[in-house]
């Protein structure tokens, strides 16, 4: 793969969960954050609700599963095009799981 070029991806994540006392205690701060990159719409994030996060925001686990799903879809479409297979629609329902021993 001598013709491979390195691609770099940069995002900025800002924690905006200081409720006035910073991280003075486990229950004293919000897990909310914002992700931005190159003028794209911001992603409002938080922790998983089980970890005191805001369920209306994307959590890192959901973003990881979405990222893997998107990569799989893009590769699938590439392989289909290369093989002369015409794809006219695509839907994926990806799922992830994790164990959280001792987190609470």
Each model region followed by its residue ranges:
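Extended beta-strand/beta-hairpin segments
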Residues: 1-66, 74-104
